[in-house]
Curated annotation (Swiss-Prot):
Encoding gene (name): gatB
Name listed for the protein in its UniProt record: Aspartyl/glutamyl-tRNA(Asn/Gln) amidotransferase subunit B
GO molecular function, one term: ATP binding
EC number: 6.3.5.-
Reaction(s) catalysed (UniProt annotation): L-glutamyl-tRNA(Gln) + L-glutamine + ATP + H2O = L-glutaminyl-tRNA(Gln) + L-glutamate + ADP + phosphate + H(+); L-aspartyl-tRNA(Asn) + L-glutamine + ATP + H2O = L-asparaginyl-tRNA(Asn) + L-glutamate + ADP + phosphate + 2 H(+)
GO BP, one annotated term: translation
Upper classification of the organism: Bacteria, Pseudomonadati, Elusimicrobiota, Endomicrobiia, Endomicrobiales
Membrane-spanning parts: none
Source organism per UniProt: Endomicrobium trichonymphae
Keywords for this protein: ATP-binding, Ligase, Nucleotide-binding, Protein biosynthesis
Length: 494
């Protein structure tokens, strides 16, 4: 059997985050009544003339600048011929040559090492409508046509064939999605069709320079679906070649429920699309000032923010990965940090890195678990960044223990109450009076002769049983550090 290597290229379509469509004033709102967001332009009535949405051009150029593209100042549009029922004009307004953005790149991390994936282009185009094959759970034996999506602005990004595994494809899409969400140029919500990916997969014998027969895969509605589709298709192609067969250049459909790809149609070539200049949209030039202004709007991107979090706040790479996984989470963390800085507490002075680490841990563990369980995002959480900062401050200044803090956190999440109020109402203030803790420790020691004997014989872990008894007697309120300190002193002197 021959040894093959995988070659993957991605075509990523991202819906541009604008209120109106790219060539008309119709709304882009998702979930509207079918065919309610339409007009004579996006349904291609005779004589209707498209008018370019400036905000759509800004979004594409801004994305290109963030991904290190060269911006082509000469902007032209073309007609790409399609004969599908969801394209009412029988052509799509798109860009052929030149695209708005040429020759960009994106860094991904694979097995701890950075790899650069070169990107051929990003161009601006309009979306098609949508064929509906079921209503609710009822499958139809006919198709319905919803043109609400027709004419919505898209930016299509095309990579070079430099991705060599499904894992690299997954990381590329995750990194791209994160950057574009940070920029605000697309919401990239795959469930709503605001980010779609077509995958071109081929294999070739190891060492061969010429690319193998390319197969395009469509219909992936999640990033993990892209990964799974590539993995399946690579194995399918290997089986075909190893059995003496030949691969066909075709478009295949990913069937997620079956975990297979299925032949859809033969793959068109560029000639089949019969591109020609769009006569209703004249070419125009982008001023240098237009590009420069967009460049100024690009602030800190995810990788740079992650590096800063690690350097300035001393947090782990794991926590930094999670905290910068979306702009909303990163903003929440820094808002909470600023709130922590502004609190006048002696316990925070000179201890900011400890506070930053503790706060990061609470967001990436406790809060993250709640968000996952409720399937919500951090923007919808009941705990404000200011209130989480207050909770962390209560731990740091010794008012409550970490264990008690989890009880307080639960109530904060359920009822949106400030932590100080919960602590006061429930009498949860930590006992830090040494004389009070000493009395409880002495009681616990006298009631734990077996654990004391084991500790004295060298089994230092036996102290855990006595600590547990102290915490039980104090209803979890005793300061754990003081408990350990006093018990060690008493036991060593026993």
């Amino acid at each position: 059997m021959a040894d093959y290597e995988t070659v993957v290229g991605l075509e990523v379509h991202m819906q541009i985050n604008t209120k109106s469509k790219v060539f008309c004033e119709c709304s882009t709102r998702f979930g509207a009544e079918p065919n309610s967001n339409t007009c004579i332009i996006c349904t291609s009535q005779p004589g209707a003339i498209p008018i370019l949405n400036k905000k759509a051009v800004e979004a594409v150029v801004k994305t290109g600048l963030a991904l290190n593209f060269s911006i082509n100042k000469r902007c032209t549009f073309a007609r790409k011929q399609y004969f599908y029922p969801d394209v009412p004009k029988n052509y799509q307004i798109t860009q052929s040559e030149p695209p708005l953005c040429s020759r960009g790149k994106l860094a991904i991390t694979i097995d701890g090492k950075e790899k650069i994936i070169n990107i051929t282009r990003i161009h601006l185009e309009e979306d098609a409508g949508k064929l509906v094959h079921e209503i609710g759970n009822k499958k139809l034996d006919y198709s319905l046509l919803d043109l609400n999506r027709a004419g919505v602005g898209l930016m299509e990004l095309v990579t070079e064939p430099e991705i060599i595994s499904q894992h690299e494809a997954l990381e590329f899409l995750k990194e791209l999605k994160n950057i574009v969400e940070y920029l605000g140029t697309s919401e990239c919500n795959m469930e709503e069709g605001k980010m779609r990916c077509d995958v071109n997969v081929s294999i070739r014998p190891v060492g061969q320079k010429e690319l193998g027969t390319r197969v395009e895969i469509k219909n992936m509605n999640s990033i993990s679906g892209v990964r799974d589709a590539i993995a399946y298709e690579v194995e399918r192609q290997k089986e075909v070649l190893n059995s003496g067969g030949k691969l066909t250049q075709e478009t295949r459909l990913w069937k997620a429920e079956e975990g297979i790809t299925k032949s859809m149609r033969s793959k068109e070539s560029a000639l089949d699309y019969r591109y020609f200049p769009e006569p209703d949209l004249l070419p125009f030039n982008l001023p240098d000032s237009f590009i420069e202004e967009l460049q100024k709007q690009i602030l800190e991107l995810p990788r740079a923010r992650k590096a800063r979090f690690i350097k300035d706040y001393g947090i782990s790479e794991y926590d930094a990965d999670y905290l910068t996984s979306t702009r909303m989470i990163a903003d929440y963390y820094e808002e909470a940090l600023n709130a922590l800085k502004n609190q006048k507490s002696d316990s925070l002075s000179g201890n900011f890195v400890v506070a930053a680490k503790l706060l990061a841990n609470w967001i990436s563990t406790e809060l993250n678990a709640k968000l996952n369980a409720s399937k919500t995002c951090i923007a919808e959480t009941h705990i404000s960044s200011q209130n989480l900062a207050k909770l962390v401050s209560l731990i740091l200044n010794g008012t409550i223990s970490g264990k008690i803090a989890k009880t307080v956190f639960e109530e904060m999440y359920e009822k949106s109450i400030e932590p100080e109020k919960i602590v006061k109402e429930k009498g949860l203030v930590q006992i830090s009076d040494e004389s009070a803790i000493l009395r409880i420790c002495e009681e616990a020691i006298s009631e734990s002769p077996k654990a004391v004997a084991e500790f004295k014989s060298g089994k230092e872990r036996a102290i855990g049983a006595i600590v547990g008894l102290v915490m039980k007697k104090s209803k979890g309120k005793a300061n754990p550090q003081l408990v350990n300190k006093i018990l060690l002193e008493k036991l060593k002197a026993y």
